[in-house]
């Protein structure tokens, strides 16, 4: 199987989440079957955990469906047999049906009626029936479960507090970096101004040098012209001298 295919990673997470949800669902069903008023804390915690777990599973199933769509759109890349692809679709459909079954039970009229009746009994402080010894044992188990839930909530609160402290430290570091970046930006702006002034000075110096070079070229041209006239005068003088000598002979 291609290492780029993420199906099996997500599938394992979904299977584990469904198993956890089934455990919560079983406990939730047991709470619905108890004749005495159920503790609000345990019932609320179980209901919320189950509802959140089912919602998370649905999101994971959507991810699995996306991976199946990717494989179907790129059969040459993944080279997945048709039987394996169908097996994946069956798995997603089976998990979705299990999730939907639990969701339907949670919103069924029977469950809603029980929750409303349980809330009324808790508020009134009156149990629905006389507690038997087995009910007392169940109450003891519920009390132990409540203590466990309280401990877990306290642990989660400590973790959240530590995360808040870490976020504050990160926020402080970000502020320091922001201040440093502002200082660096100001220094870069100052250096840019200095470079602009230096460029202007270089342009002015270049202009002055061009003027000097033009003057030197002009003087050099004038000097060259004088030398040419002097040479012509000397040649004319020599020619006249030769003519005089020829005629004198």
UniProtKB/Swiss-Prot annotation:
It is found in: Golgi apparatus membrane. The modification Phosphothreonine is found at residue 110. The gene is STX10. This is Syntaxin-10. Residues 2-228 are cytoplasmic. Residues 41-69 form a coiled coil. The keyword tRNA-binding does not apply. The chain crosses the membrane at residues 229-249. PROSITE patterns: SYNTAXIN (PS00914), T_SNARE (PS50192). It holds the Pfam family SNARE. One of its GO terms (cellular component) is cytosol. PANTHER family: GOLGI SNARE BET1-RELATED. It is a single-pass type IV membrane protein. Residues 157-219 form the t-SNARE coiled-coil homology domain. Disulfide bonds: none annotated. It comes from the Eukaryota. InterPro entries: SNARE, Syntaxin-6/10/61_N, Syntaxin/epimorphin_CS, T_SNARE_dom. The modification Phosphoserine is found at residues 108, 134, 140, 143. SNARE involved in vesicular transport from the late endosomes to the trans-Golgi network. GO terms for molecular function: SNAP receptor activity; SNARE binding; syntaxin binding. The modification N-acetylserine is found at residue 2. It comes from Homo sapiens (Human). The lineage of its organism: Eukaryota, Metazoa, Chordata, Craniata, Vertebrata. Belongs to the syntaxin family. Interacts with VPS52. Keywords: Acetylation, Coiled coil, Golgi apparatus, Membrane, Phosphoprotein, Protein transport, Transmembrane, Transmembrane helix, Transport. Signal peptide: none annotated. One of its GO terms (biological process) is regulation of protein localization.
